[in-house]
Amino acid sequence: MAEYTLPDLDWDYGALEPHISGQINELHHSKHHATYVKGANDAVAKLEEARAKEDHSAILLNEKNLAFNLAGHVNHTIWWKNLSPNGGDKPTGELAAAIADAFGSFDKFRAQFHAAATTVQGSGWAALGWDTLGNKLLIFQVYDHQTNFPLGIVPLLLLDMWEHAFYLQYKNVKVDFAKAFWNVVNWADVQSRYAAATSQTKGLTFG
């Protein structure tokens, strides 16, 4: 069975400065993200052992651990792709039109996304996703890595609001981190995810 692996980044750790420091990116990627990858692989191995023993309590525990760590791995993998030293500005084309249609304007979308990010209680994410059932863009606050994000939503743009993503640079002023994020958003990546979600996920939920 193939194991989960830590992806390489498309840019050097310091490439997003001054908006996100190289120190943060190095720790975030090589330590925190790596921990979720290891946690997911460990949970899979323990889940196999528990199934072999028909230990249902252990099965449920390791399914829970797998959900947390695998979601952490998936979210961070998208996070790194959502960022670019050549990012910033605004989306264009079909994504820009869809954002304007769903939220009224890019500025209104940005305000709602910013509010979702900066009011997360505890650890979590802000997420822009494509609703494969309702065929529309939606914003969610994600608690931890996986809670409050409905099945059938394809993530397009994520903002990591765990303290490990910003504290070394921004301390407790997470609002400033959420503002700086817009300077490094890789809209080309978000557009690519939007195009794939809208063209390849029809019928994903109900067939």
From Swiss-Prot:
GO cellular component: extracellular region
EC number of the protein: 1.15.1.1
Compartment(s) of residence: Secreted
Catalytic activity: 2 superoxide + 2 H(+) = H2O2 + O2
Binding positions (Fe cation): H28, H76, D160, H164
Keyword Secreted: yes
Keywords of the record: Iron, Metal-binding, Oxidoreductase, Secreted
Keyword hit for Iron: yes
Cofactor(s) listed: Fe cation
Enzyme class: oxidoreductase
Cofactor annotation remark: Binds 1 Fe cation per subunit.
MF GO annotations: metal ion binding; superoxide dismutase activity
InterPro entries for this protein: Fe/Mn_Superoxide_Dismutase, Mn/Fe_SOD, Mn/Fe_SOD_BS, Mn/Fe_SOD_C, Mn/Fe_SOD_N, Mn/Fe_SOD_N_sf, SOD_C_sf
Subunit structure: Homotetramer.
Summary of the function given for this chain in its UniProt record: Destroys superoxide anion radicals which are normally produced within the cells and which are toxic to biological systems.
Family assignment from sequence similarity: Belongs to the iron/manganese superoxide dismutase family.
Protein name as it appears in the record: Superoxide dismutase [Fe]
Native source organism of the sequence: Mycobacterium bovis (strain ATCC BAA-935 / AF2122/97)
Gene: sodB
